[in-house]
Amino acid sequence: MQQNQTTPDPQRWRILSVLLTGIFMALIAVSIINVALPSIQTGLEARDADVQWVLSGYALSFGVVLVAAGRAGDLLGRGGLYILGMVIYTLAAIAAGFAPSIEMLNVARFVMGIGAGFFNPQGVGMIQQYFNGRERAIAFGYFGTVVGVAVAIGPPLGGLLIRLGGPDLGWRLTMLVNVPVGILTIILGLIFFPRPYLRRLRNADGKPIGLLRTIRALDPVGSLLLGLTVLMVMLPFMESRGSAWVWAMLPAAAVLLAVWLKWEKHMKSTPTAPMVDLDIFRLRHFRNGAIIATLWFFGTTSIWVLVAQYYQNALGHSALVSGLIGLPAAVLSSFSANWAGHHLDKGGRRIVISGIAISITGLLLTVGVIALHSKFGVSEYWMILTLCFVGASGGLVISPNQALSLRDVPLTYAGAAGAVLQTGQRIGTSVGLAVILAVTFAVKDAFNWEVGAAAGFLTISTAFFATLLVAVADDRGDTKAVNLSRIAEPPH
């Protein structure tokens, strides 16, 4: 299906560099925070539950605003929303770095999540907007390279800053390291993003519409319903050790989801376009890609948590050692993502299938290393090699899947569609961490750490096998023509 094609913007590679700089900063902040948590707890004399919200608050606010922010960028201007999100994020990072208490730190992290939720979907939407064909796949490949590099250097950088600053100042430096990068990104965005950064919506006659109609076009009811749904899905898994009542949120989330779907169908029958046109789920590659993304992130985030738990709690290594174990894998991920971007036009979904298969192989080999270490004393550092399979596979799955999933989505919904994929990733991550860690600790308590870690990795392998089945089905499925003339219309 042909999308809206425009003459390539001569600034598009500079625009991409701005987008990737901001995304690099956000990923550094995510990968660095786990190393900083013990210092935060010591420095602010915080309880375990309070420290958990340093992670959970950011993840929740990020996931809740993603789709609404993506749609706002589609309507009002992606460049302006990207800069706005970066300003919010940078100011919140300053507040986090100087937070006098754990409560203030959690508030700042919550606001950082909102800022990240604003600018992340704009990045995906702008890649869709300014790149086409093979160039788009290459741009997403660079996106994956940045992910790999950020994940690789985040934990060692965090360890270095904490060592330099000590337990009181070190964790603050891990927050403030975002600030100069954020300021640089804002300046570069103001220079390179096309103007106007934001635009007013216009009616069929080309006249600007008023504030109330603009608000109505943003579908505030749909935004609220979907935001509450995401919140009620993610929160129980983040607070799984808390009160039993939180699990009542899951059936409530199912009800809210049904209401949201009905509302979006209603919005499509009105002159106002819905926040998410549900017809995009009729696109096979998008629908299957969303499932692949959710299942993949169900498992992949937990891998490195399990590695850290196994190396520190079972083997007695330091946090720095456990962080360095994954460094070669992250570097390989950056290279494989770049390679995949340059070959996606020819390889297509088969690249994703290969990546998933390689990851399953790496996980099974990792289980083998654990067993050999337990039985025969084989060095645990062989896991560096087996995890390289996992790292390389990430570059073959994440960015290629994103590019393939969004390939047929009309440009008018590029930001919202990309945000739907990212929301699936966030939900997959929160549910996966809770489930896989619960399995790991339950088996560990019944047997020992080696058996528990192996059970965790095998659970992830099972999730990846389900991901593989979806990817194979998507590759073999027939492409059916879908009438998308309605959702391709510019909103007004």
Describe each PLM feature range.
Residues 164, 168-291, 299:
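Hydrophobic transmembrane-helix bundles of small-molecule transporters
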Residues 12-28, 33-35, 271-479:
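12-transmembrane solute porter fold
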